[in-house]
Regions:
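Conserved short strand/loop->alpha-helix "switch" segment adjacent to the catalytic nucleotide/phosphoryl-transfer site
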Residues: 30-49
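GHKL-family ATPase ATP-binding module
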Residues: 1-18, 25, 49, 57-59, ...
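C-terminal interaction appendages of subunits in large macromolecular complexes
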Residues: 391-411, 426-431, 442, 446-448, ...
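Catalytic palm subdomain of template-directed nucleic-acid polymerases
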Residues: 72, 79-83, 87, 506-518
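Conserved ATPase-coupling elements of RecA-like P-loop NTPase cores
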Residues: 61-63, 88-91, 445, 517
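Short conserved segment of the HATPase_c
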Residues: 86-109
Length: 645
């Protein structure tokens, strides 16, 4: 890490007195979701991140240069760093070894206002103790002050007490190995790629820190060394290399500044795509919902380009570039590091510190205007792209105004004519089904509860918005009815408070065409109405694949395995299993039972756990470049089941 950061971290003594205790650990095993969000595979990987984050905090303090993560044959994971280790003495308040306090007492750590850490991602201080509580066992080896200290825990309890194992020479740092408790987690097998993605982010965000990820499981042996001296500049280059588009200027624009104990970094580069990719972090934690640092960046970006364009005569009179205009094709990383980070939730998804907005705004305004003055050719390329986006946005605005005017003159509702609306007016109680084709839509209209279920049949070809600007979106006969029906607008006009339905359910056939429609609609929502996904409004209906029946006995199967199970249950002989080729084959009663009735249907909620991965996947699947799409299909075809081709 750079000397500037080390100086601002104000390294001071890190000893036993700086471990502060806030409360006990009793509730973690009973209510794990309160501490790690979920006991699904996402929560499982969260355990790894909690331990690694402690090592990253050592790196932020300038005390750690290398972190080794190993997935072992028994699906345990070890994390080893060369930081300072944990203070080896006794905690005066509890009369216990400090190491034991860190792993058995909730909210015990050196990150609550003492001088052990000036900047830390582990704000809530639950990491080590929660991992201990939710693991079958944890083993810790602490190297500090020339001695090696060890302790073993099982399900949060001390199994082998704290003890000194002898001298360790010059070695320093912490080794933690844990095995998640199978009675807590739905899944206990770690995914290498999931951990790799997170560790790559951490390596980019902490320039110079080496992270080595190793998988020792039989048949899966591999190792990745992550070490990026370029920091977030390398991060932007990496993102643009992942098929988001071709950069329109050679070098990544890098800006950095500080105030007090706060440091802000921004790296950005434009490509020839129509989408924006802004990824933000606070103390190395991904802030997927944005926050004050993103707001400051966007405000300054728009101001800087407008100021430059006016100063150079590119913009005349009252002409203005909007935020959407200047962000088209942008790939940007925003990373802030600060003391007393205020997040708006335990999940740390949105930063709330108002002073960070001011800091980022100031840095970007000053540094970006300097860059534009010093690089007029690059400035011209970027502004020309923004002007093209502006013209497309203006064309879209005129198309919207024309459509509204036509509706008023013709005396018709702005709701699409094909929409079979529901009676309930309170949005949170309602749902709308986006149904493939008129034939399926006809059955769907009959097989619904019209009190709260609306049906919108899709007609025409859904536009691939990955390759289109906003004016093309407003000219698409399939997307316009969706925009009208939902009522909340898109892009900069989006207002989630105007959403007319609580659930938006995509319902398409289980064939290639149906899959294509689903990905086209998801791309549209992700690019133009992303808060719908972020706030849990978008769902995928899961209609059955088979009807299994014998006489009057009927079962619906959602997989081949379930089909075989029902055939066996019904006696085998004389049982018929019919594959549904499309939604139109179901009568209204069957549609109600399998896809509409809340007590029997299956819905998949669409969520964004990793914004970078989502962005990359949509770019690969729906972008112009064929080769990365071919690679993706080749790598993921093995995961596809029950698709009619």
């Amino acid at each position: 890490m750079e000397n500037l950061e080390r100086e601002n971290l104000e390294k001071k003594g890190y000893d036993d007195s700086q471990i502060q205790v806030l409360e006990g650990l009793e509730a973690v095993r009973k209510r794990p979701g309160m501490y790690i969000g979920t006991t699904s595979v996402k929560g499982l990987h969260h355990l790894v991140y909690e331990i690694v984050d402690n090592s990253i905090d050592e790196a932020l303090a300038g005390e750690c240069e290398s972190i080794n993560i190993t997935i072992w044959e028994d699906n345990s994971v070890s994390v080893e760093d060369n930081g300072r280790g944990i203070p080896s003495g006794m905690n005066e308040k509890l009369g216990l070894p400090t190491l034991e306090v860190v792993y058995t007492v909730l909210h015990a750590g050196g990150k609550f206002g003492g001088d052990g850490y000036k900047i830390a991602g582990g704000l809530h201080g639950v990491g080590a103790s929660v991992v201990n509580a939710l693991s079958e066992w944890v083993e810790v080896a602490n190297h500090r002050d020339g001695k090696k200290y060890t302790e073993r825990f099982e399900r949060g309890m001390v199994r082998r007490p704290f003890r000194c194992e002898g001298d360790c020479g010059d070695k320093h740092g912490l080794y933690v190995r844990f095995k998640p408790d199978p009675t807590i987690f739905e899944e206990t097998v770690f995914d290498y790629e999931t951990i790799l993605t997170r560790m790559r982010e951490q390596s980019f965000l902490n320039a110079g820190v080496k992270i080595i990820l190793t998988d020792k499981r039989e048949g899966q042996e591999r190792e990745e060394v992550l070490h990026y001296e370029g920091g977030i500049v390398s991060f932007v280059e990496f993102l643009n290399s992942q098929k988001r588009g071709t950069p329109i200027h050679k070098n990544v624009i890098y800006m950095k500044g500080e105030k007090g104990n706060s440091i802000a970094e921004v790296a950005m580069q434009y490509n020839d795509s129509y989408n924006e990719t802004i990824v933000s972090f606070a103390n190395n934690m991904s802030t997927i919902e944005g926050g004050t640092h993103e707001t400051g960046f966007k405000t300054a970006l728009t101001r800087a380009f407008n100021n430059y364009a006016r100063r150079t005569g590119i913009l005349k009179g009252d002409d203005t570039l909007s935020g959407e205009d200047v962000r088209e094709g942008l790939v940007a990383i925003i990373s802030v590091k600060l003391t007393d980070a205020q997040f708006e939730s335990q999940t740390k998804a949105k930063l709330g510190n108002s002073e960070i907005r001011t800091l980022v705004d100031s840095i970007v305004t000053t540094k970006l205007e300097e860059y534009l003055e010093e690089n007029p050719q690059e400035a011209k390329l970027i502004i020309e792209k923004a002007l093209e986006a502006n013209r497309a946005r203006e064309a879209a605005r005129k198309a919207r105004a024309l459509a509204r005017r036509k509706n008023v003159l013709d005396g018709i509702s702005t709701l699409p004519g094909k929409l079979a609306d529901c009676n309930e007016k309170e949005a949170r109680l309602t749902e709308v089904y986006l149904v493939e084709g008129d034939s399926a839509g006809g059955s769907a209209k009959d097989g619904r509860d019209s009190r709260y279920q609306a049906i919108l049949p899709l007609r025409g070809k859904v536009l691939n918005v990955e390759k289109a600007r906003l004016d093309k979106v407003y000219a698409n006969t399939s997307l316009i009815p969706i925009i009208q029906a939902l009522g909340c607008g898109i892009g900069e006009d989006f207002d989630i408070t105007k959403l007319r339905y609580g659930k938006i359910i995509i319902m398409a056939d289980a064939d290639v065409d149906g899959s294509h429609i689903r990905i086209l609609l998801l791309t549209f929502f992700f690019r133009h109405m992303r808060p719908l996904i972020e706030n849990g409004h978008v769902y995928l209906a899961q209609p059955p694949l088979y009807k299994v029946h014998k006489g009057k006995q009927l079962r619906y199967a959602f997989s081949d395995a379930e089909r075989d199970k029902y055939i066996e249950e019904l006696g085998g002989h004389g049982v018929e299993a019919e594959r549904y080729k499309g939604l139109g084959e179901m009568d209204p009663e069957q549609l109600w039972e399998t896809t509409r009735a809340p007590e029997t249907r299956t819905l998949l909620k669409v969520s964004i756990n990793d914004a970078i991965a989502c962005d990359e996947t949509f770019s690969v699947l729906m972008g112009d470049m064929v080769e990365p799409r071919r690679e993706f299909i080749s790598q993921n075809a093995k995961f596809v089941e029950n698709l009619d081709i």
